[in-house]
A protein has these predicted regions:
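Hydrophobic transmembrane alpha-helices
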Residues: 10-76, 80
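Aromatic-anchored segments of alpha-helical transmembrane domains
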Residues: 27-35, 81-89, 129-137
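Membrane-embedded alpha-helical hairpins and interfacial helices in multi-pass inner-membrane proteins
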Residues: 47, 124-197
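Membrane-helix interface segments
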Residues: 72-76, 93, 118-121
Length: 206
């Protein structure tokens, strides 16, 4: 039988209405900044490194959400909201869905393992894992290649763009793609820490 202290602790870990509103607001900001990262995709090499570019831009909303809602399920809900927004706007593919789900689960699991501690390194690693969710977008060019290139040309991309993109497909670029969430996510986390140093210090994040 649980004592009063355990019941109180379990109660504080539950998501409340205010938490859900906070998650919703930062999820919307994350989505908008992620779209901004996708716009940079008009430069072929930046599109192939999209997870890293997105990591640089989206560190602020994710890290702030982590600092404000240190409870189980927060990251999964953020991922779900983002996925729904992508689906509604027609940006979601099966491959992106797979990588996004896996990344959300890993990020949430890491936060659970570290007991949702207010520790910058733990929060940054969780964010980096979350950044791997966007891997599925550029990864499609390696998985589907010819059919993917044909599709984007039919969707209005110029022949020059498609040719430039095709010329970048290589094993070294694939390795760079897989590393990009680590680099971009780390930069994004450091930017958020620099901009909101006072908030992080007040929340006990070191």
């Amino acid at each position: 039988m649980q004592n009063k202290g355990e019941l109180t602790m379990n109660e504080t870990k539950k998501l409340k209405g205010r938490d859900l509103i906070t998650i919703g607001i930062f999820s919307a900001l994350y989505f908008i900044l992620n779209l901004a990262a996708m716009i940079t995709g008009f430069v072929p090499v930046l599109w192939l490194l999209l997870p890293g570019v997105a990591g640089v831009l989206t560190g602020i909303p994710f890290m702030l959400m982590e600092s404000k809602v240190q409870k189980p399920g927060a990251i999964l809900i953020m991922g779900l909201i983002t996925a729904v927004l992508y689906f509604v706007t027609g940006q979601f593919t099966v491959l992106l869905l797979i990588t996004f789900v896996v990344a959300c689960i890993l990020s949430e699991a890491y936060r659970a393992i570290t007991k949702y501690e207010n520790h910058f390194i733990h929060m940054a690693i969780s964010f980096i894992l979350f950044c791997y969710g966007m891997l599925g977008s550029p990864l499609a060019i390696w998985v589907y290649k010819d059919s993917f290139l044909t599709q984007i040309q039919q969707n209005g991309m110029s022949a020059e763009y498609v040719e430039s993109l095709s010329g970048l497909i290589s094993v070294p670029m694939l390795i760079a793609l897989c590393i990009s969430p680590i680099v971009g996510g780390a930069i994004g986390a450091l930017i958020s820490k620099g901009l909101f140093r006072k908030h992080f210090r007040k929340a006990g994040i070191v």
